[in-house]
């Protein structure tokens, strides 16, 4: 049996259900398990030593894990952020499939590249999102991050603006698209019931995007739907990036029908 795992501060069963359902459909003798490591270095050593084929990496480990792998694929090296590790006989290669997910969702929703964007966050997922925005042709992007060092560094890297906080909508704190890449709104967190953007920013936006996948409807997504906005959810991000991980681990690309079945199974649980 081949084992794949995920490492996260707050593990969910979504990835586990998605991957395991695909394994079952394809008749693979594989299994996927989710873990919350107490020591990241020891966990990665376990991936190497136990022959674990694949390892998904979630917040807050996407940057810390870089020092623990052997090879950085260009998808991860370009943005210094890792969400996927593939183990080939003890040699660990890091990838980033978050970028692919963001890129595909911007295209799928036909978000105009002239839209102004407020991107809240400056961690590993923010790096993937900023890179996807830049490569898609977005110019008017403001990184909103309390951490001045990481926020300004990210903004400078992609030629964007930086702000330490969100001013009121009538004082510039509005944009055509707002994107949350922080844990605000994540189930189980201290800010699980909080809006990651003020209500007036939601009202002013055309597109409301939250990368938080658990719950499927975060407070921000609920507010966006209620206001009649186009919403892009973390669950959508999770499905696409997990599918690309599956391909990296197995070398198999499931059919659209198989992916839909895995999505439906995941949502039904």
Predicted regions and their residues:
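Hydrophobic Val/Ile/Leu positions in short beta-strands of Rossmann-like dinucleotide-binding domains
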Residues: 6, 119-120, 143, 210
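Conserved beta-strand positions in the Rossmann-like core of class I SAM-dependent methyltransferases
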Residues: 33, 141-142, 232
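Conserved S-adenosyl-L-methionine
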Residues: 135-140, 226-230
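Rossmann-like adenosine-cofactor binding region
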Residues: 160-231
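Adenosine-phosphate binding glycine-rich loop
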Residues: 207, 211-269
